[in-house]
UniProtKB/Swiss-Prot annotation:
Pfam families: RNA_pol_Rbc25 (PF08292), SHS2_Rpb7-N (PF03876)
Protein's name according to its UniProt entry: DNA-directed RNA polymerase III subunit RPC8
Similarity remark: Belongs to the eukaryotic RPB7/RPC8 RNA polymerase subunit family.
Source organism: Bos taurus (Bovine)
Example GO molecular function: DNA-directed RNA polymerase activity
Compartment annotation: Nucleus
Gene Ontology terms: cellular component: RNA polymerase III complex
This protein's record includes keyword Cell division: no
NCBIfam families hit by this protein: rpoE
Amino acid composition bias (Low complexity), ranges on this chain: 166-175
Function per UniProt: DNA-dependent RNA polymerase catalyzes the transcription of DNA into RNA using the four ribonucleoside triphosphates as substrates. Specific peripheric component of RNA polymerase III (Pol III) which synthesizes small non-coding RNAs including 5S rRNA, snRNAs, tRNAs and miRNAs from at least 500 distinct genomic loci. With CRCP/RPC9 forms a mobile stalk that protrudes from Pol III core and functions primarily in transcription initiation. Pol III plays a key role in sensing and limiting infection by intracellular bacteria and DNA viruses.
PANTHER family, alphabetized: DNA-DIRECTED RNA POLYMERASE II, III (PTHR12709), DNA-DIRECTED RNA POLYMERASE III SUBUNIT RPC8 (PTHR12709:SF1)
Gene3D superfamilies the record matches: Nucleic acid-binding proteins, RNA polymerase Rpb7-like, N-terminal domain
Length: 204
């Protein structure tokens, strides 16, 4: 679920931090810049793990701050495909079941990846597994807040870097706002034995 990613960045330390240990200042600046940010095709940055190398620091004319090239390793949330995770149901919609891990919310289990047969209850706004028994179908509701075990089957990165509007977009910008896309999305599946709500598979 978590991986260590080697990175290199130039860190600017302002003069009023010179009295502190350099590593402490760099640690703070890197976490301020990267923590809780999604890096394209890398994952969600969590926190600094360690600093592996510090190159020479430079002070440029007109800027009293020091600039240091830093080699470091960062803890990144990037689960591998087919990994099994446990989260909580954040909500349900016709698009599927939305799951949260607490620190990461952009997880979707689409209808075709639910335990089948499944239906969406419009009145309750929840997905229901119509579990077949000898006594007939038994509805198992996927309620908000329930813990769910799922398999990661796909991921999607979207480059959300700001870009200048095109002429066509500029003309329509006053009419409608573009839909905000999540920079990193996971697609899950619970369509196999043992997956789904933990309460479904609790041994009696």
């Amino acid at each position: 679920m978590f991986v260590l990613v080697e990175m290199v960045d130039t860190v600017r330390i302002p003069p009023w931090q010179f009295e502190r240990k350099l590593n402490d200042s760099i640690d703070e600046e890197l976490n301020k810049k990267l923590a809780n940010k999604v890096m394209y095709n890398v994952g969600l940055c969590i926190c600094l793990f360690d600093i592996t190398k510090l190159e020479d620091a430079y002070v440029f004319p007109g800027d009293g701050a020091s600039h240091t090239k830093v080699h470091f390793r960062y803890v990144v949330f990037h689960p591998f495909l087919d990994e099994i995770l446990i989260g909580k149901i954040k909500g349900c919609s016709p698009e599927g079941v939305h799951v949260s891990l607490g620190f990461f919310d952009d997880i979707l289990i689409p209808p075709e990846s639910l335990q089948q047969p499944a239906k969406f209850d419009e009145a309750e706004q929840v997905w229901v597994w119509e579990y077949e028994t000898e006594e007939g179908a038994h509805d198992l509701y996927m309620d908000i807040g329930e813990e769910v075990r799922f398999r990661v089957v796909d991921e999607s990165f979207v480059d959300t870097s700001p870009t200048g509007p095109s002429s066509a977009e500029a003309a329509s910008s006053s009419e409608e706002l573009p839909k905000k896309e999540a920079p990193y999305t996971l697609m899950g599946s619970i369509s196999e034995p043992g997956l789904g709500l933990l309460s479904w598979w609790t041994s009696s």
